[in-house]
Curated annotation (Swiss-Prot):
Family: Belongs to the universal ribosomal protein uS2 family.
Biased composition (Acidic residues): 250-263
InterPro entries: Ribosomal_uS2 (IPR001865), Ribosomal_uS2_bac/mit/plastid (IPR005706), Ribosomal_uS2_CS (IPR018130), Ribosomal_uS2_flav_dom_sf (IPR023591)
Superkingdom of origin: Bacteria
CDD domains: RPS2
GO biological process, any: translation
Entry-linked PANTHER family: 30S RIBOSOMAL PROTEIN S2 PROKARYOTIC AND ORGANELLAR (PTHR12534), SMALL RIBOSOMAL SUBUNIT PROTEIN US2M (PTHR12534:SF0)
Key words, A-Z: Ribonucleoprotein, Ribosomal protein
Protein name: Small ribosomal subunit protein uS2
GO molecular function: structural constituent of ribosome
Ranges annotated as biased composition (Basic and acidic residues): 230-249
Region (Disordered): 230-263
């Protein structure tokens, strides 16, 4: 579990410039130095350890925790640590409705599965070069936006977010659906929007990596407890039909842009 030394070495205590702050974060601020707010690491440590246990217990109950972080400093760590603990993630861009309109998102994921099946069974080779190219392009777009959540069959039970200001749409959707939000809170964030806050820097790469690493460790610890109880996850695959293949091909050939569709 995280230590005070870890927090200091990763710069978790450095907040934003004093002119960029949310007054609701005042209770988490230790002081100010050279125009930068310094976060109270005693409180960070306490909240961190409490939240670690919350996340561990959620994983032990078999719950799905969605990792979200699309900015440059977060994308790599979000993907790396979500994969290390076998959880879904969004690190490219949050598409509006990813949780509130999850049925439509699942339909798009199904299209990805159809294209991959066509590649696997060789039916894509029966198409013209242009048709095959359009399907490949559609697959690349679907993978970029939805690859991290392709195995998420239902809405998540909890989300872990890096930068709640940038990911405000994801946080709003979670709040609307009453899905608990876990997140580091920098001095410009609104703590009222987060169920389990951890006051800390959400911009520095090392700080972001520490948060992601600790959440992954908590999840793996919880999963290990679940395995001891003999719980197992069964993943059922639905057979892909020729009709589905034709529908996806027709859509790809119409040159519909997935990213623009979901704005």
């Amino acid at each position: 579990m995280v230590s005070m030394r870890d927090l200091l070495e990763c710069g978790v205590h450095f907040g934003h410039q004093t002119r960029r702050w949310n007054p609701k974060m005042k209770k988490f601020i230790f002081g100010e130095r050279k125009g930068i707010y310094v976060i109270d690491l005693q409180k960070t440590l306490r909240y961190f350890r409490y939240t670690y246990n919350i996340v561990r217990d959620a994983a032990a109950e078999g719950k799905t925790i969605l990792f979200v972080g699309t900015k440059k400093q977060a994308g790599g760590a979000i993907k790396e640590y979500a994969e290390k603990c076998g959880m879904p993630y969004v690190n490219h861009r949050w598409l509006g409705g990813m949780m509130t309109n999850f049925g439509t998102i699942r339909q798009s994921i199904r299209k990805l599965e159809v294209i991959e099946k066509m590649e696997e069974d060789g039916s894509i080779k029966l198409l013209t070069k242009k048709e095959a190219l359009m399907l490949t392009r559609k697959k690349e777009k679907l993978l970029a936006y939805l690859g991290g959540i392709r195995y998420m069959k239902t809405q998540p039970d909890m989300i872990f977010v890096i930068d709640t200001v940038k990911e405000k749409i994801a946080v709003q959707e979670a709040n609307r659906l009453r899905i608990p939000v876990v997140a580091p809170l920098d001095t410009n964030c609104d703590p009222d929007l987060v169920t389990y806050p951890i006051p800390g820097n959400d911009d520095a790469i090392r700080s972001v990596q520490l948060f992601c690493q600790e959440m992954a460790e908590a999840i793996n610890e919880g999963k290990a407890l679940r395995e001891q109880d003999g719980e197992a996850l069964v993943n059922e695959e639905k057979e892909i039909t020729d009709e589905e293949k034709k529908e996806v091909l027709d859509e790809a050939m119409s040159e519909e842009d997935f990213g623009e569709e979901q704005e």
